[in-house]
Amino acid sequence: TEYGIKYKLDLAEIMWSPGNTGWRSALSGPEKVSEFYRFDKPKTIIDYFAGIGYFSIQMAKGYPEAEVIAIDKNPKSIEYLTLNAKNNAVENLEIINDDCRNIERKADVIHLGYIGNTIDFLEHAYDYLNDNGTVIFHEAYRNNWLGFKSRSDWGAIPENFSDLMSQNSFTVEKFERVKFYGPSTSHIIARLKKN
């Protein structure tokens, strides 16, 4: 159980990162996390890499009037996601077992909770994001590219990152370091607004 959500999974088959504790909380956790996940009456939220429901179940609970679509191409993840949605009495969650790039559904919010070439999925997200829509973007970058030299740098929006998102037609509204991801590398989260 984490922030009121019960998860069932087999660690031999499915990824679970203890370093993401708090960041999976969406609206029910620490204020610095909730700020990323506060949306103005979204009608549709899509989680592109839903896994076992780390974020999509929290968003379905936090936005009961919204349609939440959870997509993952791993059948084992979908099996646990379906079970976790049932165990948490989530009724506004549609689960799709497919590659997110095969899904052509419009949304007010698209969650890209993935590490490793997340940028490759940003164009698809842009194409299916409603005007003024929001993307929650996770990725790992080298600290020197981000300009992280000390802890005081962690809350600032790095110029390189801002430029990269601008090239992809997004404005960075909010940026935070989640955790160290390896030597001189940080897992980051950003809230992006469609231009």
For each feature predicted by the language model, list its residue ranges.
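S-adenosyl-L-methionine
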Residues: 71-109, 117
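Core SAM-dependent methyltransferase catalytic element
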Residues: 181-195
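Conserved alpha-helix/loop element of class I SAM-dependent methyltransferases that forms part
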Residues: 22-41
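Conserved class I S-adenosyl-L-methionine
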Residues: 42-49
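Non-catalytic substrate-recognition/targeting regions of SAM-dependent transferases
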Residues: 1-19
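Conserved SAM-binding loop of SAM-dependent methyltransferases across substrates and taxa
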Residues: 52-65
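S-adenosylmethionine
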Residues: 98-167, 173-176
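Residues at the starts of beta-strands that form the adenosine-phosphate
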Residues: 44, 67, 92, 134
